[in-house]
Amino acid sequence: MGKEQQLYYGKHGTPQKYDPAFRGPIYNRGCTDIICCVFLFLAIVGYVAVGIIAWTHGDPRKVIYPTDSRGQFCGQKGTKNENKPFLFYFNIVKCASPLVLLEFQCPTPQICVEKCPSRYLTYLNAHASEDFEYYKQYCLPGFQKNKGVAEVLRDGDCPAVLIPSKPFAQRCFPAVHAHKGILMVGNETTYEDGLGSRKNITELVEGAKKASGILEARQLAMRIFEDYTVSWYWIIIGLIIAMVLSLLFIILLRFLAGIMVWVMIVMVILVLGYGILHCYMEYARLRGEAGSDVSLVDLGFQTDFRVYLHLRQTWVAFMIILSIVEVIIILLLIFLRKRILIAIALIKEASRAVGYVMCSLLYPLVTFFLLCLCIAYWASTAIFLSTSNEAVYKIFNETSCPVAGKTCNPETFPSSNESRLCPGAHCQFAFYGGESTYHRALLGLQIFNVFMFFWLANFVLALGQVTLAGAFASYYWAMNKPDDLPAFPLFSAFGRALRYHTGSLAFGSLLLAIVQVIRVILEYLDQRLKAAENKFAKFLMSCLKCCFWCLEKFIKFLNRNAYIMIAIYGTNFCTSARNAFFLLMRNIIRVAVLDKVTDFLFLLGKLLIVGSVGILAFFFFTHRIRIVQDTAPSLNYYWVPVVTVVIGSYLIAHGFFSVYGMCVDTLFLCFLEDLERNDGTPERPYFMSLTLKKILNKTNKRQAEA
């Protein structure tokens, strides 16, 4: 070993020494990072305890049903409000009060009703007429007409006026509509407030602005929901096609890796080329059509996305984007053509490994199931925590009152001193909260819930990586493949990971979870600072977000390679991470080229599958396939099922290719270890396949002599 090589190895660690007893993943190993395993166990116990406490105190009905002024649910079965699903506000104009922002509740009485008002009436006109029976259903429960008009309105027993309303999110909002740009309720632009004066409709709009502000969004959501109801089975068929294509692609890759890779590259180029041609054809077709030359800036945001497809500028933008992607891919292929040949050989070797461990293709289902459990537990715990507050009642008054905002009891309030001090004040439900230790700790429990979700989700992913790495490492280090391959390598690797390395997996996933929680906090702070004018704060926030994004990517890369070393040697996390990092640094050129070129080829495979299924879905849902033209459902937005199929296809393809990616990474690290451990002599033969030896001009001397 030369002096320069000694200095180089000293800088990036020392290579693994030759061990004649080494034949792949070590079976006689001990537990690693035990203290982290203990911490994970305690954290899970605490997480379960938090879930039990949340389920004990929580009430998801608070999310589903609106509540009246006494905190009673509207429309809930088994209660007196079972047939009253809608919440009615006595004076919705009060919802524009600043108190709404402070207390998250309108300072006006609210009751549950069977249906929203459909008539315009005032209490002044209705109390002495036959309309009173209709009006009475919008008064407080149990109201009797034994008071004067002034007393009834002062005590808030009945609303001063009924306005035609429509339900939204189980709440009654004024049925405001626009006629020639003028806001109206019914045929009127003003309304009588029931107290002898007339007010402008805009005051109602201000009070109900949250509902009117999301009216278009609600219509969009309803149309999207309708599209899902009539196209869900076709979406499932599209996802099944994506799964079959992914599986077929991987099976063919085992036997025709070289041809498939080049066919894949050509197909991606052709798909992008067709996309460019289609954009140009649409651009040419719209020439001369009325309104097609309007710019995207002038058009602004539209909830009906089909409007954008009638603009020539939209298709020009699509064509430019696709052309740039096409040129970038072609240039990369030209400059990396030699390295692609080496990557193809690595993929062929990975194909053989996957072929001998076929059950590895099903392991993503295990990861998916465990991740679903993590997500379900996190989501349910979050809902129960957010609904575990107690009903808090506050004193509300339309005029100034010294006790306004104080906590009160609705049962005893009518006879209390506060009621006599402020005539006309109401003790009504304000929000859900509490003064106990548990309620004060709710924010901390929610943060803990998020943290544990990240930790457990990363642990599940780490378990999958170690399991696959152990199985594929067993394949590589088998001298006579597949005869020396152990029985059930995947199950053996899974058992070793759980039995010996739970602590190491917990350590690696903990580091990643901490960084991810910090990124979530930074995103939250960034949203809060968007309205700020402090440019330095915005710059600092952008720098922090960028730094932690890079840190997360680096930790993911380091963890992935550390897990491979753990699967092979059974060392603890820090030792494995250090050895993997130094091994990669000693072979940085191979890492930068071979590994990344392989990742690029896998990305092209995903694009081919997603593009093929996406184009098929596009032609089907736009009724452009004549054979099934009458079978395709009629939709409000054809892009709803198309986008769903595209996203689902990508996730399915990613699941299959993730197994392949882990196989390539594992074989690559084993290959680097093989080059450093062995020299091809009869005492230290190479374990790599004949194909890899041929590419690298390496031979075992006994074979060469033969």
Swiss-Prot record:
State the GO CC annotations. membrane; mitochondrial outer membrane; plasma membrane
Record field: transmembrane: 34-54, 233-253, 257-277, 316-336, 365-385, 458-480, 505-525, 564-584, 600-620, 639-659
Sorted UniProt keywords: Antiport, Cell membrane, Glycoprotein, Membrane, Mitochondrion, Mitochondrion outer membrane, Phosphoprotein, Transmembrane, Transmembrane helix, Transport
Statement: the UniProt record of this protein carries the keyword Transport? yes
* Residue ranges, Cytoplasmic side: 1-33, 254-256, 337-364, 481-504, 585-599, 660-706
Query: What's the stated role of this polypeptide?
Result: Choline/H+ antiporter, mainly in mitochodria. Also acts as a low-affinity ethanolamine/H+ antiporter, regulating the supply of extracellular ethanolamine (Etn) for the CDP-Etn pathway, redistribute intracellular Etn and balance the CDP-Cho and CDP-Etn arms of the Kennedy pathway.
- Name the record gives this protein: Choline transporter-like protein 2
Gene encoding it?
SLC44A2
